[in-house]
């Protein structure tokens, strides 16, 4: 019988502007270690209100390059540049432990994503004031 992995690790590449629907992982924290590029990690409450944002950049930039998302917390990223990062979370991977935010459009709802991202950018500006 195959051994289940205790840690789920990935090196991920996303192009600037890639949309990932906000989601949470039940019973799991998640960490991001930025390798190259620039991205904002966003934390939301259960209703989709933006609570916190952290801008990540390469180590050499002096920006934060690591962020750990708390357990069962809705989150998303805004990719400011083409970005490569290392992501780690508790394994094994289980698609059923990921809950997508009902208040955010699916990746395939292109006509809604543009307006959602515009609104999110407005919330982000207010939060960072």
Predicted regions located by residue number:
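Short loop/turn positions at the edges of beta-strands in beta-sheet-rich folds
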Residues: 16, 26, 35, 71-73, ...
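Double-stranded beta-helix
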Residues: 49-51, 78-129
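Short acidic-glycine-tyrosine-enriched beta hairpin
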Residues: 45-75
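Glycine- and acidic-residue-biased ligand/ion/polar-headgroup-sensing regions
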Residues: 27-47
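A short glycine-rich, His/Asp/Glu-containing loop-to-beta-strand
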Residues: 1-22, 28
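Short beta-strand His + acidic residue motifs that chelate non-heme Fe in jelly-roll/DSBH
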Residues: 21-23, 41-43, 67-69, 75-80, ...
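Short, surface-exposed charged micro-motifs
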Residues: 11, 31, 76
């Amino acid at each position: 019988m195959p051994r289940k992995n205790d840690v789920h690790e990935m090196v991920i590449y996303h192009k600037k502007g890639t949309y990932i629907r906000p989601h949470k992982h039940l019973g799991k924290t998640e960490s991001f270690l930025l390798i190259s590029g620039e991205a904002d990690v966003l934390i939301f409450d259960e209703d989709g209100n933006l609570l916190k944002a952290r801008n990540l950049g390469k180590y050499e930039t002096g920006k934060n390059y690591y962020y750990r998302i708390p357990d069962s917390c809705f989150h998303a990223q805004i990719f400011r540049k083409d970005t490569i990062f290392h992501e780690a979370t508790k394994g094994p991977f289980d698609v059923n432990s990921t809950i997508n935010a009902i208040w955010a459009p699916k990746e395939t709802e292109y006509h809604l994503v543009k307006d959602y991202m515009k609104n999110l950018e407005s919330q982000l500006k207010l939060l960072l004031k």
